């Protein structure tokens, strides 16, 4: 006997469906429940905290089983998707009444973290991306798709660091990678990783899939034809989404090449340290996005976060945004636009569900409501003079044909689903209205029949009723059942009553039930036809949604600029960061004390600032606010300052704070040095670099050596605009030795054992450290502080004595060349590989070295 024949027919059907979906959970519909079996049941019981039971036996073994009610399935799906799991939904598609054996079932949809479109399963104000990654010869192809909007992009990071930064920027909910993918550490700690066959990433297969999706002969029109690695990833991605959605994807109409040269590059450490959309604790409070985002719509919020994570280098684009914000701010139009745009809502995701034909009746009701707001929006925008705002207003112009169609087709307050009807409005279809009238007319007929039968037979307890089991019936109390005429056929006996059926009632029942089912069938057909009528407008609707989202972002930034007293930055191509009275956009909102604004000046003659001052004095805040102001200027936003001139920046680097990376086995110092190495390798003269307390994780001399050498390299070899905060006061001598460097410090004032931080940036180096005073503020016992002061006095005395010529100790302040340049002989020797030399070549090399001495 074959193994499959050892199972019941129902389990054979389940196992066949499970074999088609081996790597995901299978929700198998049985009556009012979705059941899971075997390993799926064990896994689901743990993830969902539901009971694990058994269902009889199959092949001689008890079958593990778990289940969830069908009416509550969305909540369970949401939890599984949040955990990175995918689920195949298997429904009964056959008629139990006509089925021989198990009812026919099939998988009707696959819910995955990266492809969900249902509102209940999505974070409203965050993009929901699925991505694919491909690797070849140290370079990467990376494609992302937002199924809820149709936004499809690819990029080709040139290194692991750049790839890690892209993964952090996009935070995909689901990540596809080939079976032979080597740098798997990039995916460590991520949910939703999906291993795919290598052939799905083949270039020709990818091009075929993409051309088929876009209806094109080639990809030249998208400007991606030479992005070979990116196309390999994009091809796998589109095939996977087609397989899971099991329908066409008409809203995915283009593939864009995201060139890294077009945007300010932010590595993973910078995004983390600047707390752009996620704070260091993993939440969203006290982030730049939390301060800037007061958008009226979720799609506006999502667009703003994309702007924050991908600042633009193009000055023209940023000036257009700033011009638009200026007009909205000066005329206070943001207060008029906000309420109208809020009524339009999140039509971007509604359109995705429309394209996938998974939209529900209330989605189309909301789309209708959005269309009804467009005339008012057009009126509000009619007085605008800015060309960019005018172009957005044109794209968001009223669509009367779509609005009129939805007003005719959909009831004012439709039900949640089409299943039970009641969605299509009266007057939309004469055929539907006719069948509905027949079904609705049943009530009047029944009332008339009840009255006639009661009077004819003198039975005052006679009632006409209906239930789902027995259909229509005539009910008579037990006490009057003897009055029932002979043609009444008993249908059911109750404790205190009898129920009967008569030919007239049976005939009416057949007619009513037929009219209801006929009306429902017509309504479902009209519903599907409505999709066909709306889909030709999809491209135009998507353009409208994008325009409204951008209007929302711009009015939001205008409101923020007005409310928070931001200024318009002056944009220039020169390498300069000149800020007057700059403020940290987040800290000034959360602190109860008045925020101390500070200036900064970086230019071609002043490329690096050595920043000293006490811990808690504000060095890190000062550095971060500079980076955030520069970043805000590169998204086309006003900035928190009295005035600001911001040059074109290609990258922002931050080396601020560090902690052990236990998962990768890296110490704090190793993390710090890795980030430092990344900066020293990749920074350019147009980069903004923030370096905070380099070298503190090792011994004093090692730390000072590394800090000095890093600062020296940045100043002499790279020339990046750099803020270099340090607790090594020896580094304040660097501006005396190298050009284009300057010292600044944050001051503090001591009063006995207490200390007051001034938080004001002053020119010059700090006069002293305040470590013991800060330790006292932290609650270190006074006895310990006293002992520390005594030890400090001894060390300072030894240092003073050691500075005399007779001393053998090292005077660090005067020994700045801690890492001397290698001699000519050492350089020549280092370039020689003895394994590659013949005896003659070795002898010649020896003579050359001898001459150099």
Curated annotation (Swiss-Prot):
Domain of life: Bacteria
Annotated GO MF terms: ATP binding; ATP-dependent DNA damage sensor activity; damaged DNA binding; mismatched DNA binding
Coiled coil region boundaries: none
InterPro entries, per database record: DNA_mismatch_repair_MutS (IPR005748), DNA_mismatch_repair_MutS-lik_N (IPR007695), DNA_mismatch_repair_MutS/MSH (IPR017261), DNA_mismatch_repair_MutS_C (IPR000432), DNA_mismatch_repair_MutS_clamp (IPR007861), DNA_mismatch_repair_MutS_core (IPR007696), DNA_mismatch_repair_MutS_N (IPR016151), DNA_mismatch_repair_MutS_sf (IPR036187)
Known role: This protein is involved in the repair of mismatches in DNA. It is possible that it carries out the mismatch recognition step. This protein has a weak ATPase activity.
HAMAP family on file: MutS (MF_00096)
Name of the protein this chain belongs to: DNA mismatch repair protein MutS
Natural source organism: Vibrio vulnificus (strain CMCP6)
Source lineage: Bacteria, Pseudomonadati, Pseudomonadota, Gammaproteobacteria, Vibrionales
